[in-house]
Amino acid sequence: MMKLIKYPSKEQWAELLKRPALNTESLFDTVRTIINKVRAEGDKAVLEYEAAFDKVTLSALTVTSEEIQKAEGLISDELKSAITLAKRNIETFHSSQRFVGKKVETMEGVTCWQKAVGIEKVGLYIPGGTAPLFSTVLMLAVPAKIAGCREIVLCTPPDKNGNIHPAILFAAQLAGVSKIFKAGGVQAIAAMAYGTESVPKVYKIFGPGNQYVTAAKQLVSLRDVAIDMPAGPSEVEVLADASANPVFVAADLLSQAEHGVDSQAMLITTSEKLQAEVMEEVNRQLAKLPRREIAAKSLENSKLILVKDMDEALELTNAYAPEHLIVETENYLEVAERVINAGSVFLGSLTPESAGDYASGTNHTLPTNGYAKAYSGVSLDSFIRKITFQEILPQGMKVIGPAIEEMAANELLDAHKNAVTVRLNTLK
């Protein structure tokens, strides 16, 4: 059950803000073995691991066009409409992030500029596990398509009958995924990192997963392929004062807790009354949840923290740097201006985390484990590279050249200096 903490001292903060431990190092030997086998044996190894881990015997990894077409008829019109609405909002928000480059003359005759280009080949990992995360398909494939990624590869584990959830296939087709493969876990990450007979090698891998997937992404990113960001268990913090609705707050905490047993939900509040009411409401709502066993286990990692004022609440919040932050206070826009460490922020009593998880338009692939102090969530920028260009004309070289020569000489790099000198000699 959630722990009630009242007026902790600053000396206690570090202990209070600890996340559930995610020890991937102990898994590295196992994960490395799987990666090496897939790298050496390709499809054969992936198929063997699918049989061992996902308990399914597959004849091929590739999802056929017939399977994709059939999926549309297997989900309700209501769900198709919801997915289409979410896709439209995600597309609208991420399209607004398009880079507009401009040429800058840093001095007369010296011009610099940038060009944004999509990463040519990207791999998206969509977990199977306890729920079909078709929303993550939209969060990753939509910005990849806007960025101009030429090849968008998706891997997701099949069920025991060898089928992919139809909502995942529908979302993938709607968002413009190029190829879909029946592969999960470490073997899927390895297949995208190194390529197999079926699965193309990609340049960057995106998507959440369990501790094995996290370890695999860490290992392949050491030298072979880029990844989106360091990942850990999902988390939410609600920052609230006496004006907050305890029913809403409890619902938000539980919506995070049902993600998985290692998720974390935190309330930081200035109201002792709210703290007590939220505890009571969490217990009431928990009893009605289908995934209550998972949520209850997660709540053991979770805390309801009472602090003396909003200044302290914000200081503690910025120290925690939550993946998701819900601000339910009287003057939430003013409070939000003082938030400097968070992945995504949800403002006011009518903005639950679920909105960003699914359909408001922001991305739900976010930094966890305190990485919001240094990392951003996935955005259009995650799928592009910015190439810099520069052009120097004669009048520019005459002015900038001597400065370059002087700097190169003082760094004892004579060839650097000479590359300028030979050009200046032609301009005399």
From Swiss-Prot:
GO molecular function (one): histidinol dehydrogenase activity
Keywords attached to this entry: Amino-acid biosynthesis, Histidine biosynthesis, Metal-binding, NAD, Oxidoreductase, Zinc
Residues spanning the signal sequence: none
Binding site for substrate: S234, Q256, H259, H324, D357, E411, H416
EC top class, as a word: oxidoreductase
Pathway named in the protein's UniProt entry: Amino-acid biosynthesis; L-histidine biosynthesis; L-histidine from 5-phospho-alpha-D-ribose 1-diphosphate: step 9/9
GO terms, biological process: L-histidine biosynthetic process
Binding site for NAD(+): Y125, Q187, N210
Record's function text: Catalyzes the sequential NAD-dependent oxidations of L-histidinol to L-histidinaldehyde and then to L-histidine.
NCBIfam families: hisD
Full protein name: Histidinol dehydrogenase
Gene that specifies this protein: hisD
